[in-house]
């Protein structure tokens, strides 16, 4: 907690690397290492190093499967939501603001980056709120929710499915 100590033991490890995950973003921590040899003789403290905790960047990949009827609309698939919480100065809740990339008639994708623990809500559209995703029985859907998680690779993959669209058969308004 303070430069120059005193120090508190936070872990006993048998590798040459350690990741301290019990930290607070923006706080500065001071670390020293002590080693034991095979006879359990303890070394002196290493030189002190300081580190300031920062949230890690997550690569966020959305893959969405859409109904076969989507292609006949000649519209692109969009994502709308609290995208302004992600990197890149993205719009908030703009139904035609962020287009996905078409992979084939029923698969679309987009990749973002953002900081771990960021929470977002989102929906898929065909460019406007008159063509927003609907449920299996053409029912209204709540917002999808997601918390960015770094995991083991730094990439979070979200596989979603849109069952129907408003104003596209079989759904009306």
Predicted regions: what is each one?
Residues 1-8, 32:
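Extracellular low-complexity, O-glycosylation-prone stalks/linkers
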Residues 9-14, 99-103:
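Short beta-strand segments within Ig-like beta-sandwich modules, predominantly Fibronectin type-III
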Residues 14-19, 106-108:
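Short S/T/G- and acidic-enriched coil/turn segments that sit immediately N-terminal to beta-strands
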Residues 20-41:
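Beta-strand-rich modules
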Residues 26-28, 117-121:
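Extracellular Ig-like/FN3 beta-sandwich strand-entry sites
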Residues 36-55:
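Extracellular fibronectin type III
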Residues 68-117, 127-149:
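Aromatic-rich carbohydrate-binding modules that target alpha-glucans
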Residues 151-173:
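Compositionally biased low-complexity segments at domain edges in trafficked proteins
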């Amino acid at each position: 907690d303070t430069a120059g100590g005193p120090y508190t033991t936070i872990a006993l490890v048998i590798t040459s690397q350690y990741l301290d995950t019990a930290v607070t973003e923006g706080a500065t921590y001071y670390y020293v290492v002590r080693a034991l040899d095979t006879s359990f003789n303890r070394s002196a403290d290493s030189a002190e190093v300081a580190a300031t905790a920062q949230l890690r960047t997550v690569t966020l990949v959305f893959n969405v499967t859409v109904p076969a009827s989507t292609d006949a609309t000649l519209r692109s698939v969009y994502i709308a939501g609290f995208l302004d919480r992600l990197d890149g100065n993205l719009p908030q809740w703009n139904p035609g603001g962020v287009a996905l990339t078409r992979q084939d008639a029923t698969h679309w994708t987009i990749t973002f980056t953002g900081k771990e623990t960021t929470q977002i809500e989102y929906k898929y559209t065909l460019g406007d709120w008159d063509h927003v995703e609907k449920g299996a029985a053409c029912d209204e859907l709540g917002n999808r929710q997601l918390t960015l998680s770094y995991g083991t690779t730094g990439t979070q993959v979200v596989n979603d499915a849109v069952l129907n669209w408003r104003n596209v058969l079989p759904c009306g308004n």
